[in-house]
Amino acid sequence: MHVACCQFDIVWENKPANYAKVEAMIAQAALPTGTLLLLPEMFATGFSMNAEAIAEGVKGPTARFMAELAARHGIYVLGGVVISADHGQKARNEALLFDPSGTLLSRYAKIQLFTPGGEAAHYQPGEEHGLFLLSDCPCQIAIC
């Protein structure tokens, strides 16, 4: 399996601009089918504590972008997104993994929040270490 890491200068809290940057990089990279593409934590917004403004549902625009990217290129796509909370709770800093058909394969909510950066004041920590198989290889997502 090929693994590709995508690092770029994120446009602060501007999802469409960041989607366009990822699209351009992937088009240029010409990744082989089945590649695992790794996008940064909160790649569509930057590491923002403005959770209420940037949070979206698990089927929101960033998840749709990732699913479409995976299906269009026949690759796995893993990236960070802020997911809206249930009523009365804080949003979660999550990573979503889509398979080459664009289906959500796994999701993980960051467990160890970055307290010095104020993350714990704005986000709800995750509780589970979502394990999954990728090409018969046991894997686990982590967000630093």
What is each of the regions a protein language model found here?
Residues C6, L37, Q140-A142:
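Hydrophobic positions in the central parallel beta-sheet of the AAA+
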Residues E13, F47, L113-P116:
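Conserved protein kinase catalytic core
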Residues K15, E23-S101, R107:
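Cys-nucleophile CN-hydrolase/nitrilase-fold catalytic domain and related Cys-dependent amidase chemistry
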Residues E56, D86-C144:
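Active-site catalytic loop in hydrolytic enzyme cores
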Residues M1-C5:
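Extreme N-terminal starter segment of soluble prokaryotic enzymes
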Residues Q7-W12:
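Short polar catalytic/cofactor-binding loops
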